[in-house]
Amino acid sequence: MSTESMIRDVELAEGPLPKKAGGPQGSKRCLCLSLFSFLLVAGATTLFCLLHFRVIGPQEEEQSPNNLHLVNPVAQMVTLRSASRALSDKPLAHVVANPQVEGQLQWLSQRANALLANGMKLTDNQLVVPADGLYLIYSQVLFSGQGCRSYVLLTHTVSRFAVSYPNKVNLLSAIKSPCHRETPEEAEPMAWYEPIYLGGVFQLEKGDRLSTEVNQPEYLDLAESGQVYFGIIAL
């Protein structure tokens, strides 16, 4: 074989190779699809994390450290004013004990922090109901003494004289004793105080009369105002 033939064969062998199907355009398309898939997965993962940790989405109502709902002071004030207006036209009474009379419960309505409103009356030391309905009845007395030379039993009772039947009925009653044991004669007597509070809701009729009683009025402590009182509020 001649030298020229050999050179020509080498040149033919070094010619351009045939391109594979797809070429650079196919590679770019695959790269774009890969990037799109990665971004889609990353976005979905981020959204899931935000929802899981409640960074986005509906927020819960704000609560106080004690897990109590915070109260809007404006709404609370409106509620209190509405309740006050609702009670302003209903019968009510709050009477206090006369500190000038010892040894008995004498109720007074013409004193500071005492009142009779919307038909309520104080007659013969009794509160007179002006209309049928549900009423909150309450009363408190305070007993005091020095030592316990003997066993002391104290009672406080609220009674009703109804127009529908003549007999007196006890609505509220309580018994207490300040002395769990007698004070020795050689020991110095210690002062004791025993309050009794009564309260309840009852259906009353127009003309019913309410009174209070204590079994040992000599132990009543009337030294300070606001300690002994009697009241009724229509509901």
From Swiss-Prot:
Topological domain (Cytoplasmic) residues are 1-35
Q: Which domain of life is it from?
A: Eukaryota
Its membrane topology, per UniProt? Single-pass type II membrane protein
Q: Where in the cell is it found?
A: Cell membrane
Cite the ranges annotated as topological domain Extracellular. Answer: 57-235
Record's keyword terms, sorted: Cell membrane, Cytokine, Disulfide bond, Lipoprotein, Membrane, Myristate, Phosphoprotein, Secreted, Signal-anchor, Transmembrane, Transmembrane helix
- Identify the Pfam families for this entry: TNF
Question: Which residues are annotated with the PTM Phosphoserine?
Answer: S2
Q: Where is this site: Cleavage?
A: S34, L35, L39, L40, C49, L50, L51, H52, T79, L80
Positions where lipid (N6-myristoyl lysine) attaches: K19, K20
Q: How does it assemble?
A: Homotrimer. Interacts with SPPL2B.
Q: What is this protein called?
A: Tumor necrosis factor
Q: Which organism is it from?
A: Oryctolagus cuniculus (Rabbit)
The major lineage groups are: Eukaryota, Metazoa, Chordata, Craniata, Vertebrata
